[in-house]
UniProtKB/Swiss-Prot annotation:
Name of the protein in question: Hsc70-interacting protein 1
GO molecular function: heat shock protein binding; Hsp70 protein binding; protein dimerization activity; protein-folding chaperone binding
Subcellular location: Cytoplasm
Domain STI1, chain residue ranges per copy: 294-336
Any one of the GO BP annotations: chaperone cofactor-dependent protein refolding
Residues modified as Phosphoserine: S80
Outcome following mutation: S105N: In strain: XCPA112
Region (Disordered), start-end ranges: 68-123, 243-302, 344-377
Domain of life where this protein originates: Eukaryota
Pfam families reported for this sequence: HipN, TPR_11
Bias (Gly residues) ranges: 282-293
Length: 377
């Protein structure tokens, strides 16, 4: 029965035999009963005893742990491990959500016409309205304060502080989204306005956006430090740090996932290539008994079933010199090249190379001295 083995299979077989010679009780494992039967069939014996790994580090050369049951898989495939790792659910970060409120959904408040340039009279009127709004705010009349700030904004829409102070009043009414809208405009008009960062940071804290809140409150402290802002910053910092650490962890996991996906794809590509090479018959590592030549033995045996080929081979084997008779027959001559190692037909049959198998050109015969014309009569 012909079969095909790759060079890598031979290396594994040699390693297996070397290991068995050093650890003969290894052959007593249930998985290797057929090998033990083979040894005993030819008069050999396997020492009794149980293989415990010992010098082999508890590992078998074909994988798995020494002493493992035959029906247990030695190791889970790497691809399965990768699939499990890639599909692991991402953990959620635990935050202290005390003080977080439901977001408001009121229509956007009037923001005024930014392109309008206020007159001196309008600026003065807006300043008076701001004073009235501050008074109403001090009396905790927050709706009234918002209405007065709105009038001041319509008169002088380019005043960033008016928007920030109206945002503060919205904050008191537990309307963080409205506060954020006003603070966004205030910071667009004046990016160095500490009040805009302060009140927007507080609004974001109420919505549970701790990382963004910490960023705003930190910036407010840099621009104009006050104790209330610092207290708010300390309140959000623990949750903000947890979120930042969790985000960095997820970024690392994502990077690792991409690396594992790439490695898995590379392994699969290698396996597919190996399968393709094996199915195409390989080349240098194939043999099935006899002298390995350049061809697949199954093809050679098939050609030998041809009566003409079989007769020619018998003729050559009986007299190697007869190979020259078939130099002009491609079917027979090419088959011989497949059988011969390296395809060197001449060397295989004791001749000086492949050209020896072909009829040599007749060499011109030198003229005898008796017939040399020396030009003399």
């Amino acid at each position: 029965m012909a079969f095909t083995m790759q060079t890598g299979d031979l290396k594994k077989l040699k390693y297996f035999i070397d290991f068995a010679l050093e650890n003969p009780t290894f052959l007593n494992m249930p998985q290797l009963q057929f090998v033990k039967d083979f040894v005993e069939k030819f008069g050999g014996t396997v020492p009794p005893g149980q293989f415990n790994g010992g010098s082999a580090g508890g590992k078998c050369p074909f994988g798995g742990v020494a002493g493992a049951k035959a029906n247990e898989p030695a190791n889970a495939p790497e691809d399965s491990e990768d699939e499990k790792s890639l599909s692991d659910p991402e953990s959620d970060v635990e935050l202290d959500m005390e003080g977080v409120i439901e977001a408001d959904s009121d229509p956007a408040q009037p923001m005024g016409n930014y392109s309008k340039k206020a007159t001196e009279e309008e600026v003065e009127q807006a300043s008076e309205l701001r004073a009235q709004a501050a008074s109403a705010y001090g009396q905790q009349k927050f709706d009234e304060a918002i209405a007065l700030y709105t009038k001041a904004i319509e008169l002088s829409p380019g005043n960033a502080l008016f928007h920030a102070k109206r945002g503060q009043a919205f904050l008191k009414l537990k309307k963080p989204n409205a506060c954020i809208r006003d603070c966004d405009v205030a910071l667009e008009l004046n990016s160095d306005l500490a009040a805009g960062y302060k009140f927007r940071g507080r609004a974001r804290r109420l919505l549970g956006d701790f990382e963004l809140a910490a960023h705003d409150l930190r910036q407010a402290c840099k621009l104009d430090f006050d104790e209330e802002t610092d207290e708010w910053l300390k309140e959000v910092t623990p949750n903000a740090k947890k979120i930042e650490q969790h985000r960095l962890k997820q970024e690392r996991r994502q990077a690792e996932r991409k690396i594992k996906e790439r490695q898995r794809d590379q392994r699969r590509a290698r396996k597919e290539q190996e399968k393709h090479n094996a199915s195409s018959g390989g080349s240098s590592g194939e043999f099935s008994g006899g002298n390995p030549g350049n061809g697949n033995m199954s093809d050679i045996l098939g050609a030998m079933s041809d009566p003409e080929v079989s007769a020619a081979i018998q003729d050559i084997l009986s007299n190697p010199g007869n190979i020259t008779k078939y130099a002009s027959n491609p079917k027979i001559y090419n088959l011989i090249k497949k059988i011969v190692p390296g395809g060197d037909v001449g060397a295989a049959f004791g001749q000086a190379g492949e050209k020896a198998g072909k009829p040599s050109e007749p060499k011109p015969k030198k003229d005898s001295a008796d017939f040399v014309d020396d030009g003399l009569d």
